[in-house]
């Protein structure tokens, strides 16, 4: 997976707002929003298994964000399934432009969809 960063912080959106979480920020976006605060260039390129090793023992709440996570759909589905099988509380933040399969959405505790008006949208 192409990642920008992995970091711990407090969740700022949704029902887990104010709670500690581990953030996995994926690179790439299909919009070009004016004022975007995310550097979309990847700094890490890890397999799903390598990513899981890096985050092991860092808490039970994981926020998958971006960029736009659904641009790496195959790896995203694999990651969500593996996190789910480990009993993780999974949150995802998306711009809502791509569909996540229903069977995968059912494994996610919270999906925050934040539509944006990019120049290519």
Feature roles, as predicted:
Residues 7, 27, 39, 67-70, ...:
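Anionic group-transfer/hydrolysis microenvironments
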């Amino acid at each position: 997976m192409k990642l920008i960063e992995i970091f711990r912080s407090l969740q700022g959106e949704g029902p887990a707002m104010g709670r500690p979480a581990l953030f996995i920020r994926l690179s790439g976006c299909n919009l070009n929003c004016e004022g975007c605060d995310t550097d979309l260039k990847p700094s890490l390129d890890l397999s799903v298994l390598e990513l899981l090793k890096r985050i092991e023992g860092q808490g039970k709440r994981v926020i998958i964000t971006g960029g736009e996570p659904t641009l790496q759909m195959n790896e995203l589905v694999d990651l969500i399934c593996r996190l789910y099988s480990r009993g993780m509380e999974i949150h995802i933040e998306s711009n809502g432009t791509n569909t996540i399969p229903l069977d995968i959405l059912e494994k996610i505790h919270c999906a925050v969809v934040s539509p944006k008006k990019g120049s290519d949208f």
